[in-house]
Amino acid sequence: MSRVSQARNLGKYFLLVDNMLVVLGFFVVFPLISIRFVDQMGWAALMVGIALGLRQFVQQGLGVFGGAIADRFGAKPMIVTGMLLRAAGFATMGIAHDPWLLWFSCFLSGLGGTLFDPPRTALVVKLIRPRQRGRFFSLLMMQDSAGAVIGALLGSWLLQYDFRLVCATGAALFILCAAFNAWLLPAWKLSTVKAPVREGLGRVMADKRFVTYVLTLTGYYMLAVQVMLMLPIMVNDIAGSPAAVKWMYAIEACLSLTLLYPIARWSEKRFRLEHRLMAGLLVMTLSMMPIGLVSSVQQLFVLICTFYIGSIIAEPARETLGAGLADPRARGSYMGFSRLGLALGGALGYAGGGWLFDSGKAMNQSELPWVMLGVVGFITLIALWWQFSPKRSASGMLEPGA
């Protein structure tokens, strides 16, 4: 085995271990924020939605700058610094008794993510060969699902005692992850050329095809982020116990572990990436619209199952499509900018979703936020269809199996 192949092979295992620590640290804390501050402390969903949206917007909206800096200085210092900032954000969240302190803790958490997320994604693009990326992204997503349910179970158990324990555990996991990267991550460069930060940003902004794709995904993410805000609140309201939230993540883990990789393998040779993305989004949209009308936990979990299946179809295609469009001369910048759709969609989905949820409750129209999200989903589908129509994609979006 050549040294390059050996480095790629070892890199895969490093990425998998690193990803598991990050996912555990995140899901110990974040699924329980809405339960803690809305249900236990009686805050308005809008206040918590602003906090979650702020974290999302800071992490993903500034990601292009984090990626560009990583292109210039390498992945390791950015990743280690970002994970320590995330740990500081979680520690601050544990003592948050006013909205401004929760917002500040989410800002710190998002700033940390801005630094570590783009270089981590760029390392995947650097180390995994193009033909293997779709499957590797599927493996990472399966791991995300397993880590999510383990983290949510641990967080739910700790929440019985004290929310500060929840936050301390999340902070400790990110400190451990920072140490793991500081010790074992080589000083790899992300891009094929060591260009100034400004040049990397310029390459991305000049790539209209990539910019259009990223911005179109804003609507997709407005639906996707509800697994952190409105879905846990709905499960808690209907089941009458925050412990039921862990079953939502258990469902996701079971579906992902059994279906994600087989669906990705089967579909990658039969359908174009953009068609898989649109099919998944359609399933997500159709499953979300009736949620406000359900009256039993069983009905709610059936719709949540369907929503997760749509996500399983869409996510590997979305990641692979974005990675395939990145210019190797500015990988970090591209991966950072690719998060802008998540930044906008997350901010709008959290703050707008929280406001719609409160409004629906006040007007006794619980279906309002879900119907509006369904409308957003259909608008996004139309935008994706327009972008990837045969005439516009003749110059070559990615073919199946590319």
From Swiss-Prot:
GO MF annotation: an example = transmembrane transporter activity
Query: Which residues belong to the signal peptide in this entry?
Result: none
Record's GO cellular component terms: plasma membrane
Classification via PROSITE patterns: MFS
Q: Which residues cross the membrane?
A: 13-33, 34-54, 99-116, 139-159, 165-185, 214-234, 243-263, 277-297, 300-320, 340-360, 368-388
- Which regions form coiled coils? none
Check the record and name the Pfam families matching this protein. MFS_1
Q: Where in the cell is it found?
A: Cell inner membrane
Q: Does the keyword Aminoacyl-tRNA synthetase apply?
A: no
Cysteine pairs bridged by disulfides in the record: none
Regarding the membrane, this protein is recorded as: Multi-pass membrane protein
Keyword Transmembrane included in the entry's annotation:
yes
Alphabetically list the UniProt keywords. Answer: Cell inner membrane, Cell membrane, Membrane, Transmembrane, Transmembrane helix, Transport
Highest taxon, organism lineage: Bacteria
Family annotation (NCBIfam families): PRK11646.1
Family stated for the protein in its record? Belongs to the major facilitator superfamily. DHA1 family. MdtH (TC 2.A.1.2.21) subfamily.
- Mind telling me which HAMAP family this protein's record contains? MFS_MdtH (MF_01529)
Return the protein name: Multidrug resistance protein MdtH
Recorded source organism is Enterobacter sp. (strain 638)
